[in-house]
Amino acid sequence: VIQRYPFKHVYTGIDKTVKRAVPAKIIRQIRDMDLSHDSSLEYARDLFMFSFYTRGMSFIDMAYLKKSNLQNGFLSYRRKKTNQQLVIKWEKPMQEIIDKYDTIGSSYLLPIILDAKTDERKQYKNAAQLVNSKLKKLGKQIGLPIPLTSYVARHAWASIARSKNI
């Protein structure tokens, strides 16, 4: 039987999805980087790692996390995109990141939305842009073949979890 694919070279308007996941080895390398010389790179890395530790939580969900979402050793929140309720066991590496940043006087868990009086969505978008530009810089420093963004943490967690049958 001869198989022919007459449309093999026809563009369908759908590009192949670029793989955004990185292996666990790269996640460890990102985690272990000494970024004490640049607080904005360190902040971006810490938010990337927080996302990874929280099963690849999206940046918008991290931005809107409230301290009240953390109770009895669990982080419980509604995903903005799907309105799905998610519950994640609170682990030491998550707490270490939270402890590193001062959010006293704020109801937010992470220092992304800093001023309740200012447009929250604008603050989130500005922070996302800053963090992703810093992550791209980090990715270049370690020679990643793809741009490092907050989205990579989500895909990395999913890929690593799948490989471990989680």
Show where each model-derived region lies:
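Short, charged hinge/linker segments at domain and secondary-structure junctions
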Residues: 1-15, 111
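Short, contiguous acidic/charged loop-to-helix segments that flank catalytic cores in large enzymes
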Residues: 17, 35-38, 76-89, 117-127, ...
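Active-site/catalytic core of tyrosine-dependent DNA strand-transfer enzymes
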Residues: 21, 26-28, 91-145
